[in-house]
Amino acid sequence: MQDPNICQHCQLKDNPGALIWVKCDSCPQWVHVKCVPLKRIHYSNLTSSEVLSYPNSAKQIKSYRCPNHKEGEYLTAYALITQKGKRQRNKENPEDSHINKRYNFRKKKLLDYIALNEGESKRDKMNHPHKESFMKSFEKWKNGSNIINAADFAEKFDNIDVPYKIIDPLNSGVYVPNVGTDNGCLTVNYITEMIGEDYHVDVMDVQSQMNENWNLGSWNEYFTNTEPDRRDRIRNVISLEVSNIEGLELERPTAVRQNDLVDKIWSFNGHLEKVNGEKAEENDPKPKVTKYILMSVKDAYTDFHLDFAGTSVYYNVISGQKKFLLFPPTQSNIDKYIEWSLKEDQNSVFLGDILEDGIAMELDAGDLFMIPAGYIHAVYTPVDSLVFGGNFLTIRDLETHLKIVEIEKLTKVPRRFTFPKFDQVMGKLCEYLALDKNKITSDVSDGDLLSRTTNCAIQSLHAYVIKPEVKYKPLNFTSKKHLAKALADLIS
């Protein structure tokens, strides 16, 4: 049998005139892209366009089938389209998407993991190049002691600054409905039926860490009805927000609901006199970041990232398994993260080898995981998995949130990857604190929000809100300047 690492066309391992390799989707065979006859290459995004030149980057290749199969050789590529003097990818380009994403992947350079192992040489679509490094780092930092019961977690919430696995998730308040399946677990098929096959989802290609535009029907066919060895690529859905989906009864943990800063301050202006004659923003929807469904196939990998605004995260595994590798937001780790984010060759560096004080946690079906603000983390999926999770800002982590937002600006994170309406949330918080509204709230379980806000946090909030680029029109103060003055008066 021929060595699959030898090009089937030129019979060479190394060909100076053909540096880009591609692996067959259906077998281990590798070939040089430039050895494939042009007549066997087709564009995925153009229906009637003759291919006159070879792809010049592994990122342009969508799929490949080698001559060993009866269907014949066939390479599918993305066409690069020139428009108004600029080279642009077609409409499948994830840069065209304007839906808020949870994770602030950098705009500096699209990650090209496809050709990482050998520059632009070989392209294995079923194994992420960082998988081995991730597993080594996971074993190094493996942690079995960060566990806590739900009652203690809720009671100690303000003082918690490390990730915890909740040992009694059934007592946490998190709720995922049982459905009419064999084991009663929520499934991708059920979610598709509830939301609709035509509903848009952003699907991440694990190798390139880039998003593609799919509908739920196509995703369900890929996830539910395609055997793992028949999948053309490893893919991941991590940004399906479902808080507004009727009939999908999901409930967040009690500790999350009690400490979600947006929930506390978003609508309070409606109960106070408006000195500007403005109406409260009753019809202004809250940021939708509270309930996500995450669907990942075996070997899916999400590279190191910060959730937008460094939000805290709750993470309930419905089915499958997850491996988390997390690093705290120490100044040293943050500095290294910024440096890595700004590197042109960041895809060649496994950040976990550089960061310090790691925590590695393995999650199984039924587990509930709580991540505090600012943790830099990567996630690996050993088996097909379905997860219910979400993000939330807290008064506990206000300084961290503000710090991460500045890092997002420094590293030029696209707006759609940032926390929606963050400046508006901060403005409302300023009014809430300045007016000390929490003292007259009817919900005594809220506690005294102002007393939970440190002087340092108020100083950081004041420094943020007075920036000219932060736009907010107060409802209870004549101007942002007067609001800032009232906030400054709180600092003792």
Curated annotation (Swiss-Prot):
Q: Where along this sequence does the record place binding of Fe cation?
A: H305, D307, H377
Q: Which reaction does it catalyse?
A: N(6),N(6)-dimethyl-L-lysyl(36)-[histone H3] + 2 2-oxoglutarate + 2 O2 = L-lysyl(36)-[histone H3] + 2 formaldehyde + 2 succinate + 2 CO2
Keywords attached to this entry: Chromatin regulator, Dioxygenase, Iron, Metal-binding, Nucleus, Oxidoreductase, Transcription, Transcription regulation, Zinc, Zinc-finger
The UniProt record lists the JmjC domain at 254-409
Miscellaneous comment text of the record = Present with 784 molecules/cell in log phase SD medium.
Protein species of origin = Saccharomyces cerevisiae (strain ATCC 204508 / S288c)
Query: Could you state a single Gene Ontology molecular function term?
Result: transcription coregulator activity
Its recorded name reads JmjC domain-containing histone demethylation protein 1
- Top-rank taxon of the source lineage equals Eukaryota
Query: Where, in this chain's numbering, is substrate bound?
Result: T302, K322
Q: Which InterPro entries match?
A: JHDM1_Histone_Demethylase, JmjC_dom, Znf_FYVE_PHD, Znf_PHD, Znf_RING/FYVE/PHD
Q: Which gene encodes it?
A: JHD1
